[in-house]
Amino acid sequence: MGKSILLINGPNLNLLGTREPHIYGSTTLPDIVASSKAHAESLGATLEAFQSNHEGAIVDRIQEARGNVDGIVINPGAFTHTSVAIRDALLAVNIPFIELHVSNVHAREPWRHHSYFSDKAAGIIVGLGAYGYKVAVEHVALNFKERASL
């Protein structure tokens, strides 16, 4: 049984490819999801993707992952700077996670520099564009522990 990865994308990431392409690039979220799934499969893992613009929906999906997922890759979008609820959900389920950002948040507005997730993440990927998803999926597939079988 291969590792199971949950890919979560937060608010406005459904607009990737058309939203500020000079910052976020031209790759769409469906393209990112398709390539992430294919890469996970090539490494013997499975990947499920979830996107929501709503904080509570993301919290619910993280809670549903408890006991069913080996690792989470999360691009929290703007919730990076505001969501204690998503942070608490990630800590409550005790699933290691990678925090991912398409743009280099540290080269942008000062308020984007703070993250509620970075101090608890197993790793942080910033500024690599859509390629960052491949790096994150590969790291989870090759380095995270597989959950114990029942």
Curated annotation (Swiss-Prot):
Domain of life: Eukaryota
GO biological process, one term: quinate catabolic process
Pathways involved: Aromatic compound metabolism; 3,4-dihydroxybenzoate biosynthesis; 3,4-dihydroxybenzoate from 3-dehydroquinate: step 1/2
Residue sites binding substrate per the record: N75, H81, D88, V102, S103, R112
One function term, GO molecular function aspect: 3-dehydroquinate dehydratase activity
Record carries keyword Lyase: yes
Enzyme Commission number, as recorded: 4.2.1.10
Site (Transition state stabilizer): R19
Catalytic residues (UniProt): Y24, H101
Record's catalysed reaction(s): 3-dehydroquinate = 3-dehydroshikimate + H2O
SUPFAM superfamilies, sorted: Type II 3-dehydroquinate dehydratase
Enzyme's top EC category: lyase
Keywords: Lyase, Quinate metabolism
InterPro entries from the UniProt entry: DHquinase_II (IPR001874), DHquinase_II_CS (IPR018509), DHquinase_II_sf (IPR036441)
PANTHER family, alphabetized: CATABOLIC 3-DEHYDROQUINASE
Function: Is involved in the catabolism of quinate. Allows the utilization of quinate as carbon source via the beta-ketoadipate pathway.
Similarity comment text for this entry: Belongs to the type-II 3-dehydroquinase family.
Summary of subunit composition and partner proteins: Homododecamer. Adopts a ring-like structure, composed of an arrangement of two hexameric rings stacked on top of one another.
UniProt protein name: Catabolic 3-dehydroquinase
Lineage, broadest ranks: Eukaryota, Fungi, Dikarya, Ascomycota, Pezizomycotina
Gene responsible for this protein: qutE
